[in-house]
Structure formats: C-alpha cells, structure tokens
Regions:
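Conserved non-cysteine loop/helix-boundary elements of the Radical SAM core domain that shape
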Residues: 1-48, 55-78, 97-107, 168-169
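Structural detector of well-ordered beta-strand residues that form the stable sheet scaffold
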Residues: 10-11, 51, 86, 131
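Short hydrophobic alpha-helical runs that function as membrane-insertion/retention elements
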Residues: 11, 51-53, 152-156
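A generic short-segment signal for beta-strand/edge and adjacent turn/coil regions
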Residues: 54-57, 122-124
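Auxiliary Fe-S-binding modules of radical SAM enzymes
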Residues: 70, 76-202
C-alpha cells in the first residue's frame, strides 16, 4: 500500500549489530536480526531499495562485526537491494548504557576509518556506496573517511533527534559546508538524489 501511495525506498536503520545477543543488550525493544533481514527481503522483492547500516562502538566483539558484514553481504548477493552501507559509531553521552557503566566512551576516529576501509573491501562489487558518517564523527573525520574508502559525505539533516540528544556536536550542515569540506581535500563535490543518480556537479 505504501508503494502504491508513492514510497520509492526504505531506510536501513534499526540493524544496529545483526547479532541478537548484542541487540538484546543495546536495543531490547527493537526487532531482532531475523525480522530486520525479513523486512529488507520483502522490501527488495517489492522493488524498494534501501541502505544498510551498522552501529558499532558499544558491546560488540569483532566476531559480531564479521557476522553483521556476512549477513548484509549474503542478502545483497541474493537480492541486490542495498544502495549504500553506512557504518556509524554509538555515541554514549546521555544514554542509559553510559549511566549504567556499560559503555563509557565512544569508539573514536581511528575505528571509523578502519570500518570505512573494511566496508569498502568487503562490499567491493556488491554495494557501490559507503557513507562517511559525519553525523556521529564530525566533518573532519568525514573528510578522512572519504580518503579511506567512503564516496558519500552524507546529506544535510533537518530535525535530527537521536544524535543531537547526546550533545556531542551540531547535527545540521549546510550544502555549502559540505561542498567546502569536500573541496578542501581536493575532491569534486557531486550532488545526488536518493538513488545515487547525479543531480549536478557543485
């Protein structure tokens, strides 16, 4: 019904880490891994593409990260519905997990760069676009992420209400700030639409 009403794609949020032992700790009220994958499959079969996300930097292990990558890769090989992959770090400030001492500090910039580089290698030939995650790591780290394998700076946001609650940084960027940040590292800025089709060179 939503597609008939004009829906053209779906978000890939809510994946967190696709390991249920982790999801039970960090997001017990959200759907489990199988349900997330089922929803993505049904969306792809209806012709609705999505992004795939991974939230790292909390209680996950390296094995959990590998399992997450593996599930995303297998689903993409089967149905080819993911337009982009977005790894982003958990920001613990003002969260219950921080108050309970489960997560005390964020993952940091080096971990972001590792995740970007690993994502580019794992999804080579599978998922074309890797997003820089400026929202959780800042503009400077997004510039580095582009040089480590990201090709999507990420968009301007209006009314973001999750990361902004952590008080870590501004959650809005103008298009000029994004363009300037890309040009500062000697890359060309290109505006795209939701489906990664070129709108204009900037």
């Amino acid at each position: 019904r939503l597609k008939d009403a004009g829906l053209q794609s779906v978000p890939g949020a809510g994946a967190e880490i696709l390991t249920d032992s982790v999801k039970e700790i960090i997001s017990p009220k959200k759907i489990d891994s199988d349900d997330w994958i089922r929803i993505m499959k049904e969306s792809f079969e209806l012709g609705l593409p999505a992004s795939a996300t991974m939230m790292y930097g909390h209680v996950e292990t390296n094995n959990d990260i590998v399992e997450h990558y593996d599930k995303i890769a297998k689903l993409q090989k089967d149905l080819n519905g993911f337009m982009a992959f977005i790894p982003w770090s958990f920001e613990p400030n003002n969260t219950l997990m921080q108050k309970e001492g489960i997560v005390t500090v964020g993952a940091g910039g080096m971990q972001l760069l590792k995740m970007i580089a690993i994502s580019r290698i794992i999804f080579d030939g599978l998922i074309d676009h890797i997003q820089s995650s400026w929202l959780t790591n800042g503009v400077g780290m997004a510039q580095l992420a582009i040089q480590y394998g990201s090709d999507d700076f990420g968009g301007t946001l209006i009314g973001e209400e999750v990361v902004s609650c952590t008080g870590s940084r501004s959650t809005e960027l103008t298009d000029k700030r994004i363009i300037d940040s890309i040009k500062q590292i000697d890359y060309s800025a290109e505006e795209r639409d939701n489906f990664y089709e070129r709108v204009s060179m900037r």
